[in-house]
């Protein structure tokens, strides 16, 4: 048995025991013994992912985090040590011509737009993003495609062995999950000789492990809001300070229109860093007098992300003295805001095609499968859920209404971490769902599930308790909505976030019923009632709480002319749903 295989078994045994207090060592061994042996000469992809997952519970890393909490700068210093142990220096990253992007809402979509625009120029692109939806290799892309399982496996073990070989008494820990993937992305991009790399910040900016990048070509900040407050601060201004930490001396940076307070913080951070910061004009300004721009991603909020992406791509091409940009006519708007406005220009044909052809699964995505329509959006902050509700309601109003049978509206929701799920659910309440379904971000309740979907940082009891809390919040909101005071209050303004025309409610609805399931698979089986070809033979409903809704709702769903399902609250939840609805994504 190879060293790697032996080390993998030992690490996973420890991870299984430490992550699940009720799991015995014998059970962990039985779980491990069920794995198929890897094909020689190398380790298989799933083995690499299982080993990567052990870094989620790396005990020495957790101890390191406790020590570094009062000194966040030490986190960046530790990342530089890991980079050196892996065989790279910080200066090596300058070869990647990086576009570094942070933000609270839309940073992933902005990166996707930017990468697709530049790829349309024939450039070889690298793209590092998080989290993944179905497979962890989605986080590292070359020319828009996730790296192959073979390439992932090769680079994973090469990096793992390198870090093991060059550890010493003072640096014995392996980097944790996200740090390891960040290092791996840098190695992949350098070895694949990309022309540029689009790098999405993980959390925050100032102390994020991607911020060892010292000389990006350009930086971007998407819309700001409240998220990860325990790490970044409890006000938008504090969060803006963290996000502005990616600014570098002399490196152009762009942001979209923000509230006055956080915009002032970004301006001050830029001035302190000697970073030229520009405010993006709205997309309409770039369309003025020209053809309307078509976006590959749905939702009005994507226009802000597209405007930022155009400026990032334009600046990158300008810095590289690209022929297409030298001939582009631009105008410099007068200063009307706290910041100078970025140039206005008519997008080139390559830019237009890039915006039109952008794909970013799990964000304002619609899947139609027979009578079921799935609306997938990984919104997980108050501002992004507001945008999700607007998109969902607009999509419903454009949808065709069936001639036979009522329409049924279902919410599938989960929220994790320190996010205020009650606040998120309150924003979803006006959509007037018939059923609210809650489940953890687990595709199956089984220890043999795909390694890409495993999370060792929480226990099953913890995630189920969280779902029951979601259900309790929803029930309280439903009771309040049904109260005479609520019914007599003014209706939401048409077109406002959360506004849904009463005519869209099915005639049989008298209120929202809620259910909790132990995994995504059981939730989808109940919602689809065998009417989706993937779930033609559903097992009996497995609601955690006995509820007449399970049986009465099943008959209504079976007879419905159309079933509209909004899946939101967590990108991990959306990823699990996509994994089950589109099995090809796991191949």
Swiss-Prot record:
<keyword id="KW-0496">Mitochondrion</keyword>
<keyword id="KW-0999">Mitochondrion inner membrane</keyword>
<dbReference type="GO" id="GO:0005743">
    <property type="term" value="C:mitochondrial inner membrane"/>
</dbReference>
<dbReference type="InterPro" id="IPR018109">
    <property type="entry name" value="Folylpolyglutamate_synth_CS"/>
</dbReference>
<comment type="subunit">
    <text>Monomer.</text>
</comment>
<feature type="modified residue" description="Phosphoserine">
    <location>
        <position position="539"/>
    </location>
</feature>
<feature type="binding site">
    <location>
        <begin position="106"/>
        <end position="109"/>
    </location>
    <ligand>
        <name>ATP</name>
    </ligand>
</feature>
<keyword id="KW-0460">Magnesium</keyword>
<comment type="similarity">
    <text>Belongs to the folylpolyglutamate synthase family.</text>
</comment>
<keyword id="KW-0472">Membrane</keyword>
<dbReference type="GO" id="GO:0005524">
    <property type="term" value="F:ATP binding"/>
</dbReference>
<feature type="binding site">
    <location>
        <position position="377"/>
    </location>
    <ligand>
        <name>ATP</name>
    </ligand>
</feature>
<dbReference type="GO" id="GO:0005759">
    <property type="term" value="C:mitochondrial matrix"/>
</dbReference>
<dbReference type="InterPro" id="IPR036565">
    <property type="entry name" value="Mur-like_cat_sf"/>
</dbReference>
<dbReference type="InterPro" id="IPR023600">
    <property type="entry name" value="Folylpolyglutamate_synth_euk"/>
</dbReference>
<keyword id="KW-0436">Ligase</keyword>
<dbReference type="GO" id="GO:0004326">
    <property type="term" value="F:tetrahydrofolylpolyglutamate synthase activity"/>
</dbReference>
<keyword id="KW-0554">One-carbon metabolism</keyword>
<feature type="binding site">
    <location>
        <position position="130"/>
    </location>
    <ligand>
        <name>Mg(2+) 1</name>
    </ligand>
</feature>
<keyword id="KW-0963">Cytoplasm</keyword>
<feature type="binding site">
    <location>
        <position position="200"/>
    </location>
    <ligand>
        <name>Mg(2+) 1</name>
    </ligand>
</feature>
<protein>
    <recommendedName>
        <fullName>Folylpolyglutamate synthase, mitochondrial</fullName>
        <ecNumber>6.3.2.17</ecNumber>
    </recommendedName>
</protein>
<dbReference type="InterPro" id="IPR036615">
    <property type="entry name" value="Mur_ligase_C_dom_sf"/>
</dbReference>
<dbReference type="GO" id="GO:0046872">
    <property type="term" value="F:metal ion binding"/>
</dbReference>
<keyword id="KW-0597">Phosphoprotein</keyword>
<comment type="function">
    <text>Catalyzes conversion of folates to polyglutamate derivatives allowing concentration of folate compounds in the cell and the intracellular retention of these cofactors, which are important substrates for most of the folate-dependent enzymes that are involved in one-carbon transfer reactions involved in purine, pyrimidine and amino acid synthesis.</text>
</comment>
<comment type="pathway">
    <text>Cofactor biosynthesis; tetrahydrofolylpolyglutamate biosynthesis.</text>
</comment>
<feature type="binding site">
    <location>
        <position position="363"/>
    </location>
    <ligand>
        <name>ATP</name>
    </ligand>
</feature>
<keyword id="KW-0479">Metal-binding</keyword>
<dbReference type="InterPro" id="IPR001645">
    <property type="entry name" value="Folylpolyglutamate_synth"/>
</dbReference>
<feature type="region of interest" description="Disordered">
    <location>
        <begin position="484"/>
        <end position="508"/>
    </location>
</feature>
<keyword id="KW-0067">ATP-binding</keyword>
<keyword id="KW-0547">Nucleotide-binding</keyword>
<keyword id="KW-0809">Transit peptide</keyword>
<feature type="transit peptide" description="Mitochondrion">
    <location>
        <begin position="1"/>
        <end position="42"/>
    </location>
</feature>
<dbReference type="GO" id="GO:0006730">
    <property type="term" value="P:one-carbon metabolic process"/>
</dbReference>
<dbReference type="GO" id="GO:0005829">
    <property type="term" value="C:cytosol"/>
</dbReference>
<feature type="binding site">
    <location>
        <position position="228"/>
    </location>
    <ligand>
        <name>Mg(2+) 2</name>
    </ligand>
</feature>
